[in-house]
Regions:
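Rossmann-fold NAD(P)-binding glycine/threonine-rich loop
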Residues: 1-11
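Predominantly a Rossmann-like dinucleotide-binding segment in NAD(P)-dependent oxidoreductases
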Residues: 9-13, 18-105
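Beta-strand scaffold of nucleotide-dependent catalytic cores
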Residues: 39-43, 125-128, 150-152
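Glycine-rich phosphate/pyrophosphate-binding beta-alpha loops
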Residues: 78, 103, 127-135
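Generic preference for hydrophobic
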Residues: 94-96, 126, 141
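A short, glycine/Asx- and small/polar-enriched loop/turn
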Residues: 107-111
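C-terminal glycine/acidic-rich active-site capping loop/insertion
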Residues: 113, 118, 138-177
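Glycine-rich GHKL/ HATPase_c ATP-binding element in histidine kinases
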Residues: 122
Length: 177
């Protein structure tokens, strides 16, 4: 931007502070240790940042391209998107459906459903919005040997299988489940 060009000696950096959150550091350790095996699917529904029309109307810069540069993806969700990449790696494909001003009188996105694929074939979804008054925050990371479930960015449950899924696939009959 123009202001940065005026001061080339000044360093600019961005910090994604959620990487320092002990909860997510523990999840990263679990993933890096291979506890749940190879990534198969990740799904994050993060709709817990409800905003009213009065919120958007309170300042001219809110929910505008000129003021914020975007909507929910830029203002509320960048930390979660960073965590997804940090925890699960960089997707090789990403597609998204965005709705602009779908539930509020704004010009930027307020409802997003994204789908992505990873180099190993794993898939993922990321759903976010600012119009869910009850809100949800649930991240599931599914591997071929277990699953991590994070609820409300506060609690972590690790479910581990005694054998990898592909072994169960060959050994068990569906009636044994």
């Amino acid at each position: 931007n123009e202001e940065a060009e005026k001061h080339p000696d000044v360093k600019f950096a961005m910090m994604f502070n959620q990487r320092t959150n002990p909860l997510y550091q523990k999840v990263k350790e679990i993933l890096d240790a291979g506890t749940i095996g190879n990534l198969r699917r990740v799904s994050w529904i993060i709709t817990s940042w409800w905003r009213t029309q009065k919120y958007y109307d309170s300042s001219a810069w809110r929910a505008t391209w000129a003021g914020e540069g975007g909507g929910v993806l830029v203002n509320q969700a960048p930390h979660q998107l960073d965590l997804l990449q940090w925890l699960c790696g960089m997707p090789s494909l990403m597609e998204a459906h965005l709705k602009y001003g779908s539930h509020r009188n704004i010009t930027v996105e307020d409802d997003v459903t994204a789908y992505f694929e990873y180099p190993n074939g794993a898939t993922g979804t990321f759903i976010t919005c600012t119009h869910d008054a009850l809100g949800t925050d649930r991240l599931e990371i599914h591997g071929d040997n277990g699953k991590i479930i994070i609820t409300d960015s506060k609690s972590v449950v690790v479910k581990k299988m005694d054998k990898p899924e592909d072994v169960w696939n060959h050994e068990l009959d569906f009636r044994q489940m």
